[in-house]
C-alpha cells in the first residue's frame, strides 16, 4: 500500500537484479505505487552488490537507517553516521544523504515537526564534519568499498541544549573559565595567570 515501508532493502535475500544485472521491475512498480524503501542496515541486511547495482540504475533508498544492536556496533553497521558515510562512498550527494537520515524519516512516520531546522521547530541538531581522506567501509558479506569522506559528529543539541561536545566547542578556554572553576569547595583562588 502507499506509505508502506520496505526496510532492509539491500539485504542479500531480495532478488533486486535479474540475471543481466538490471533492476527487477517489481521494485520500480512498488516505488511508483508509493512504497518507501529503507536501508535498515543491521548484521546481514546490507550488501554492496545489491546497493551499488541499484544506485547505478538511479534507485536510491527513501530513508537511510540502521538496525543497530549489540552484535553489529563493531561492524558492519557501527552507527548511523558510518552507514550514512557508505552512501557518500557510493556516490550519493551529501545533501541527499542528510535528507535521508533526517527529514525523510520524519515525514515517513508523519512527524513533520522533526528533522527540520524551521523557525519554531524543536532544536535537535547534530553538528557534523565531513572528514576528507581514504576510508574503507564494510558490508554484511565482509566486502569493502573505499570512499573519500567520513561523517563525524562534533556536537549534538537536544531542544537547543548541548548534550554531546567531544571537542569542547561550547566550553570556555580553561584560562578564561568562570570563578567556580578556580576554587575547590571551601577555598578561593589565590593566584593569577601571567601571559
Report the location of each language-model feature:
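Active-site core of metal-dependent hydrolases
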Residues: 1-74
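P-loop/Walker A phosphate-binding loop and immediately adjacent motor/lid segment at beta-alpha junctions
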Residues: 20-44, 83, 90, 140-162
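Long, low-complexity intrinsically disordered regions
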Residues: 173-195
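Short, solvent-exposed coil/turn elements at secondary-structure transition points
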Residues: 12, 43, 103, 131, ...
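A short linear-motif detector with a strong N-terminal bias
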Residues: 43-44, 104-107, 133-137, 142-143, ...
